[in-house]
Regions:
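N-terminal beta-strand motif that seeds the catalytic metal site of vicinal oxygen chelate
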Residues: 1-19, 67-69
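Short amphipathic alpha-helices in soluble, non-transmembrane regions
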Residues: 27, 82-86
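A short linear hydrophobic-aromatic micro-motif
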Residues: 32-35, 56, 89-93
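Short acidic/glycine-enriched loop/turn segments that link adjacent beta-strands
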Residues: 39-43, 63-65, 97-101
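Short acidic/polar mixed-charge low-complexity motifs
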Residues: 52-53, 111
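Mid-chain, well-packed structural core segment of small domains
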Residues: 69-83
Length: 120
C-alpha cells in the first residue's frame, strides 16, 4: 500500500538577504514570523502563510541552493520503504527537534522535494 501525503507543509526559498525578504513577506504579503525555527547553522526564518509555512534560507551560492517544497506525511519510514522498493534514491536527514523527520528526494527534472513528518 502506498504511503499517504497529508498536504503541503512548507515551501523553502533561498534568499541572499533574509532581513530584506522578511520585510517583503511580513510587511507586503502579511505573513507572520514563527519563533520555533531550530538552529540549522545558517541564517533563515520560518513564516506562517495561512496554514502552510514559508522557510527562508540564506544561501548566496547557487551551487548550495536548498530551494524545495515539502509534503507533510504521516509515516516517514513507510516512505523510505516505498522508495527502496522502487530503487528511488533519497537522503534521510538526522532528526532535528522542532524540524520533524525529513527525507529529501529529487524528481526526474531535478527539483528537490522534502517529505516531512512533523514532531507531535
Amino acid at each position: 500500500m502506498k504511503p499517504n501525503i497529508a498536504g503541503v507543509h512548507h515551501v523553502a526559498l533561498c534568499v541572499a538577504d533574509v532581513p530584506e525578504a522578511l520585510m517583503f513577506y511580513i510587511d507586503v504579503m502579511g505573513c507572520s514570523l514563527r519563533a520555533d525555527r531550530p538552529d540549522f547553522g545558517f541564517p533563515g526564518a520560518w513564516l506562517d502563510a495561512g496554514p502552510q509555512q514559508i522557510h527562508l534560507m540564506a544561501f548566496g551560492d547557487p551551487e548550495r541552493s536548498m530551494s524545495h517544497f515539502a509534503l507533510q506525511v504521516d509515516n516517514i519510514d513507510a516512505w523510505c520503504e516505498h522508495f527502496d522498493a522502487r530503487s528511488v534514491a533519497y537522503q534521510r536527514s538526522p532528526h532535528t527537534p522542532g524540524a520533524g523527520q525529513q527525507v529529501f528526494v529529487h524528481d526526474p527534472a531535478g527539483n528537490q522535494l522534502e517529505l516531512n513528518q512533523p514532531d507531535h
